[in-house]
A protein has these predicted regions:
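Adenine-nucleotide phosphate-binding core of ATP-dependent small-molecule kinases
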Residues: 268, 275-279, 286-322
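Glycine-rich phosphate-binding loop of actin/hexokinase-like ATP-binding domains
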Residues: 153-258
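Phosphate/pyrophosphate-binding loops at sites that engage ATP/ADP/AMP, CoA/4′-phosphopantetheine
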Residues: 72-88, 193-200, 315-326
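Oxyanion-binding "anion nests"
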Residues: 251, 256-282
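Short beta-strand-loop/turn "lid" adjacent to the catalytic site in phosphate-handling enzymes
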Residues: 73, 77-125, 146, 152-161
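N-terminal glycine/serine-rich phosphate-binding loop of ATP-dependent small-molecule kinases
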Residues: 1-98
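Glycine-rich phosphate-binding loops at beta-strand->alpha-helix junctions
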Residues: 326-338
């Protein structure tokens, strides 16, 4: 059975094609569609065992982008399947499932409506994730679709860890609480790490560190998420590439008032102008920060020390919270390569 996996962003589509009939799942191809909606779009298709294929043309929307992906998958030269009939299901990464979805689920009209209802608290991700689902309905009608939510794994957090000490009515009215993200990654690496280490996942204390341009850390107690560094949004927690992580809210309101910033401008500052980029003034990429660090750039030194210091702080906090730790697992671009 061939599965197509999609991660749809606002102007991009990441995809993988996996053969699940093999004794162990086998990657057939992966690729990336970029610059959707811009005058010149790009498709990079990487079939396993074949030459990489690139296409450059306008890609006005996600439906067009996914159609180009399907054409590449069945191309006589660059393709990996003979017919689209071989694609039996499509899996979608969906950033935010709120409190609706403790597990992955088949996509129905009701599921689509719940994803849509979360647009306000996940405006950067959920609209594009839903667009991918709707596009598949157009180009692969009748194929089963599964939504895999970043937030699902963290639905086991105890209330003491997911509630904020704000007036309780805001949780009741607006769902203001810690949701956590990167849950699919944390769940997978905790289980794989336990297998490699010979640990019983159901009787273990594991700390998983997903460190990339965005990053989060999770305390996994007996196989379940017990605490996690991201909060109501992915801006909370670690010092990330362009996201600030933990910060006193009063500092944010003070800056907004002094700079006469709108809500959108404040949100942009926290999400896109802060983190190691904001502190260093050099880059959001840790490879660039490392080079500047080695050159003695004082702000790059400060940014890197803050970045790694916050990781150590959360690891220590979660070890104390669980009463010890059996294993620490690193994943993500920085976590795996730094």
């Amino acid at each position: 059975m061939v599965i197509l996996v999609l991660n749809c962003g606002r102007s991009s589509i990441k995809y993988q094609v996996i053969d699940m009939e093999a004794q162990s799942s086998k990657l057939l191809a992966k690729g990336l569609v970029e610059r959707i909606g811009l005058p010149e779009g790009d498709l990079t298709h990487k079939p396993v065992g074949k030459e990489k294929f690139e296409l450059h043309q306008p890609i006005p929307d996600h439906t067009t982008g996914i159609s180009l992906v399907l054409q590449a998958l069945t191309d006589p030269v660059h393709g990996v399947i003979r017919s689209l009939d071989e694609v039996k299901a499509v899996g979608h990464r969906v950033a935010h499932g709120g409190e609706f979805f403790p597990e992955s689920c088949l996509v129905t009209e009701q599921v689509q409506e719940k994803i849509r209802s979360l647009f306000q608290i996940a405006p950067l991700h959920n609209p594009a994730n839903l667009e991918g689902i709707l596009s598949i309905e157009k180009v692969l009608p009748g194929v089963k679709q599964v939504a895999v939510f970043d937030t699902s794994f963290h639905q086991t957090l105890p209330a003491t860890n997911f509630m904020y000490a704000l007036p309780y009515e805001y949780y009741q009215k607006y769902g203001i609480r810690k949701y956590g993200f990167h849950g699919t990654s944390h769940k997978f690496v905790a289980r794989e790490g336990a297998k490699l280490a010979g640990l019983d996942i159901n009787n273990s204390k594991i700390i998983t560190c997903h460190i990339g341009n965005g990053g989060s850390i999770t305390a996994v107690l007996n196989g379940k998420s017990y605490d996690t560094s991201m909060g109501f949004s992915p801006v909370d927690g670690l010092v990330m590439g362009t996201r600030c992580g933990n910060v006193d809210p009063s500092a944010v309101t003070f800056i907004g008032e002094k700079e006469q910033m709108s809500y959108a401008e404040v949100n942009n500052m926290l999400n896109k102008q802060s983190g190691v980029f904001g502190v260093s003034g050099v880059s959001s990429d840790m490879r660039d920060i490392d080079l500047a660090y080695d050159e003695g750039n004082p702000r790059a030194i400060l940014a890197r020390d803050m970045h790694y210091g916050r990781i150590r702080k959360f690891v220590g906090e979660y070890a104390a919270e669980m009463g010890g730790v059996d294993m620490i697992v690193f994943t993500g671009g920085v976590g795996e390569n730094s």
